[in-house]
UniProtKB/Swiss-Prot annotation:
Keywords on record: Repeat, Seed storage protein, Signal, Storage protein, Vacuole
Transmembrane segments: none
Described purpose of this protein according to its UniProt entry: Zeins are major seed storage proteins.
Species per Swiss-Prot/TrEMBL record: Zea mays (Maize)
InterPro entries hit by this protein: Glia_glutenin
PANTHER family: PROLAMIN PPROL 14P
Protein name, UniProt field: Zein-beta
Molecular function as annotated in GO: nutrient reservoir activity
Entry's Gene Ontology cellular component terms: aleurone grain; vacuole
Localization of this protein: Vacuole, Aleurone grain
Signal sequence segment: 1-19
Amino acid sequence: MKMVIVLVVWLALSAASASAMQMPCPCAGLQGLYGAGAGLTTMMGAGGLYPYAEYLRQPQCSPLAAAPYYAGCGQTSAMYQPLRQQCCQQQMRMMDVQSVAQQLQMMMQLERAATASSSLYEPALMQQQQQLLAAQGLNPMAMMMAQNMPAMGGLYQYQYQLPSYRTNPCGVSAAIPPYY
């Protein structure tokens, strides 16, 4: 029985190493770009760096998620640690800018709607709110944004993670045949 388990483990490892050998190594296309100050968009448009695009889609940019993409490389992952951090920081900055832009647009629409409805129905309440904000030295837009902006720490941590039932990237289940 132990021999069968050892044989199965050996076959699984050999199959994994064979698939890693067939995967194009992202190191080859990266050597010219590494340290050259190329941005994320330049690297993603390079065409030969498809594994890095897949890696960036992984949640949290974790080193464990990167293991399949660096498996075919003969170099250590310590060389790629600065690149990995740079990509994660760039990705977070892009998400932060998008989130702030969406929040600003939503807040401006809400402010317009609140101003229109308040001026028609409750001008005294609107005036009281403006006086309170002026006494505190706060801009109404800044106060509304501060109340409605989510905390940035860990917000995007699981944004791109697939649900547990969608683990197959193609969305096709091998165990359950499709219904016709």
